[in-house]
Curated annotation (Swiss-Prot):
Ubiquitinated; mediated by SIAH1 and leading to its subsequent proteasomal degradation. Pfam families: zf-C2H2. The gene is Klf10. Transcriptional repressor which binds to the consensus sequence 5'-GGTGTG-3'. May play a role in the cell cycle regulation. Plays a role in the regulation of the circadian clock; binds to the GC box sequence in the promoter of the core clock component ARTNL/BMAL1 and represses its transcriptional activity. Regulates the circadian expression of genes involved in lipogenesis, gluconeogenesis, and glycolysis in the liver. Represses the expression of PCK2, a rate-limiting step enzyme of gluconeogenesis. It comes from Mus musculus. Disruption phenotype: Male mice display postprandial and fasting hyperglycemia while female mice are normoglycemic but display higher plasma triglycerides. SMART domains: ZnF_C2H2. Residues 94-145 are annotated as: Disordered. This is Krueppel-like factor 10.
């Protein structure tokens, strides 16, 4: 390493002499192409007037290869175990070109050297016993690596004798922020894991999801945004209590639509997850699980996706709507055992105690029984029983007083009906057609015809009237 530094020093002194001798010589046309290169070297050497005095101080702490930190040979760079604590951004050699892309150039230097030049130079100057230096071992979650063939300039650090801190070195500041972010995520993840161990199986299962670096901004990384997936059964209400709530809790309410779950007759419902921090006096975990009868089929619970900036360290209450399970209704059966239609109204059943049994009139009791052997008929009145007994004995006390008529009857109503046949009296008249009848049973039979005629069409009524008209007899034809 010391020989290489001495060679660099001799080369720089030779360049200084060449620059001082060049103006003395005559200017030739072929020197115009190299004029820009010499001016760039002269400006670069003038900016580092004190480099020679501090060269030995930085020589022990810097690698000998001018390869970029992010070149394709970063795994083969020489280094020592003591250099693991110093960011690689501060270990590049002095006077390296400024940040450039493959299509850009530096204002103070010539065109940027190619990657192949870096590779060959590093292979030639690489010591055999050096250990490879890996930046990924120091900061595994640092900012994403820069694209290939991009050099990093640290000319502003060559004049400093101090090591980089988090204020002057942006790489170290980014690593500290990422370390704080990782420690916060591990602490939050540990709290959730401890809470999950105390909750019954399949109650709450948080899963860390990996955020994509290309879609997460730097502001989100500093804020420590976390994404958790809580699978909460919709048939349970889980109350998780891990630590007391902070003095100034931050409430976060998110409306998340659960994914479509193909269940029989149960449509997917949106689930509202709201963080409600409550003061917890004791470190108990209480789980409220409603008991379901074994006859009901188990309802398929839709997973609930909870998203928030961070999980509070207090009590977390998840309120999940209960699934509606449509159980088949048993058919309605009447007291007599007859099945009723589901659309038919339910019959009204009156209680048996409300029924009032009507009192039986003592006068309507069939207390009069015929004493004739083998008869046993009963009657309400004694007169009816007396008339019945006359049928057994053959007694007819009522006789017709019409002149020349000697008929006798067992009942008085029969005698009255017989007398009308002699007189021609028609006591019973029809109120609709004014027809008269001698017997009441004849009038009743006639009234039935009027009741049936109301239900018939008009043409049938006309036909019935025509049938009532007696046709005149046809005259006998001459022989």
């Amino acid at each position: 390493m010391l020989n290489f530094g001495a060679s660099l020093q001799q080369a720089s002194e030779g360049k200084m002499e060449l620059i001082s001798e060049k103006p003395r010589e005559g200017m030739h046309p072929w020197d115009k192409a190299e004029q820009s290169d010499f001016e760039a070297v002269e400006a670069l050497m003038s900016m580092s007037c004190d480099w020679k005095s501090h060269f030995k101080k930085y020589l022990e702490n810097r690698p000998v290869t001018p390869v970029s930190d992010t070149s394709e040979d970063d795994s083969l760079l020489p280094g020592t175990p003591d250099l693991q604590t110093v960011p690689a951004f501060c270990l590049t050699p002095p006077y390296s070109p400024s940040d450039f892309e493959p299509s850009q150039g530096s204002n103070l230097t010539a065109s940027a050297p190619s990657t192949g030049h870096f590779k060959s130079f590093s292979d030639a100057a690489k010591p055999p016993g050096a250990t490879p230096f890996k930046e990924e071992e120091k900061n595994p979650l640092a900012a994403p690596p820069l694209p290939k063939a991009q050099a990093t300039s640290v000319i502003r650090h060559t004049a400093d004798a101090q090591l980089c801190n988090h204020q002057s070195c942006p790489v170290k500041a980014a690593s500290i922020l990422n370390y704080q972010d990782n420690s916060f995520r591990r602490r939050t993840h540990g709290n959730v894991e401890a809470t999950r161990k105390n909750i019954p199986c399949a109650a709450v299962s948080p899963n860390r999801s990996k955020p994509e670096p290309s879609t997460v901004s730097d502001g989100d990384e500093k804020a420590g945004a976390a994404l958790y997936d809580f699978a909460v059964p919709s048939s349970e209400t889980v109350i998780c209590r891990s630590q007391p709530a902070p003095s100034s809790p931050v409430q976060k309410s998110v409306l998340v639509s659960s994914p479509t779950v193909s269940t029989g007759g149960v449509p997917p419902l949106p689930v509202i997850c709201q963080m409600v921090p409550l003061p917890a006096n004791n470190s108990l975990v209480s789980t409220v699980v409603p008991s379901t009868p074994p006859s009901q089929p188990p309802a398929v619970c839709s997973p609930v996706l909870f998203m928030g900036t961070q999980v509070p360290e207090g009590t977390v209450v998840f309120v999940v709507p209960q699934p509606v399970v449509q159980s088949p209704r048993p058919p309605v059966v009447s007291p007599s055992g007859t099945r009723l239609s589901p659309i038919a109204p339910a019959p009204g059943f009156s209680p048996s105690a409300a029924r009032v049994t009507p009192q039986i009139d003592s006068s309507r009791v069939r207390s009069h029984i015929c004493s004739h052997p083998g008869c046993g008929k009963t009657y309400f009145k004694s007169s009816h029983l007396k008339a019945h007994v006359r049928t057994h004995t053959g007694e007819k006390p009522f006789s017709c007083s019409w002149k020349g008529c000697e008929r006798r009857f067992a009942r008085s109503d029969e005698l009255s009906r017989h007398r009308r046949t002699h007189t021609g009296e028609k006591k019973f008249a029809c109120p609709m057609c004014d027809r008269r009848f001698m017997r009441s049973d004849h009038l009743t039979k006639h009234a039935r015809r009027h009741l049936s005629a109301k239900k018939l069409p008009n043409w049938q009524m006309e036909v019935s009237k025509l049938n009532d008209i007696a046709l005149p007899p046809t005259p006998a034809s001459a022989q």
